[in-house]
């Protein structure tokens, strides 16, 4: 049985048919890759230290140079079927206020802390509470947590929005400064580190 490409190219002479076969194959492959990036999985580079120690921006002492930063994959499809969950690392477009507060905006990667309608509180020791219950944040570096202990505050998360924070709290410009993130701004869930080779792993 002939496939779609065979049916298109059958009337052509041999040499031309081979050329058209290759062109059609490349076009289909490119279209498939673009569709996957748009709707299923997309790669991102970690440009800062705001998610240390979970996601690295560079080798120790090297600064956040592009060739050393973690590259991650985000599942763009999952949130079409369910809502984001607390503790997930999420890729999202920042609200406009982020540019004013942080000097930068665009696409950020942070951890989801507060869900719609909840109240998030950070005490003077860097502990987080959601609706009065302390979060178990084993993913934090204790030393970095102590560095952030001088920034207590309380924030209410509006309906339809999500409160995002970096794991490296003292070096993270996040929802504490520019507010919660609307549901429509959320792009996807980070599920894996794919570069550099020694850092390849899945993220729960």
What do these predicted regions represent?
Residues 1-31, 35, 39-204:
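Soluble "head" domains of membrane/secretory-pathway proteins
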């Amino acid at each position: 049985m002939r496939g779609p490409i065979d049916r298109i190219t059958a009337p052509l002479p041999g040499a031309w048919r081979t050329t058209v076969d290759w062109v059609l194959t490349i076009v289909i492959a490119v279209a498939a890759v673009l569709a996957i990036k748009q709707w299923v999985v997309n790669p991102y580079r970690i440009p800062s230290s705001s998610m240390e120690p979970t996601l690295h921006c560079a080798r120790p002492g090297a600064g956040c140079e592009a060739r050393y930063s973690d590259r991650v994959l985000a599942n763009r499809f999952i949130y079409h079927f369910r809502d984001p969950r607390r503790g997930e690392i999420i890729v999202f477009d920042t609200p406009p206020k982020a540019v004013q507060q942080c000097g930068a905006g665009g696409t950020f990667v942070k951890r989801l802390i507060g869900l719609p309608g909840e109240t998030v509180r950070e005490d003077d020791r860097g502990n987080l509470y959601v609706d009065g219950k302390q979060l178990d944040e084993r993913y934090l570096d204790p030393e970095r947590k102590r560095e952030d202990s001088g920034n207590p505050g309380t924030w209410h998360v509006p309906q339809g929005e999500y409160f995002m924070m970096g794991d490296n709290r003292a070096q993270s410009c996040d929802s504490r400064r520019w507010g919660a993130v609307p549901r429509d701004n959320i792009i996807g869930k980070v599920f894996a580190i794919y570069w550099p080779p020694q850092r390849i792993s899945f993220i729960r």
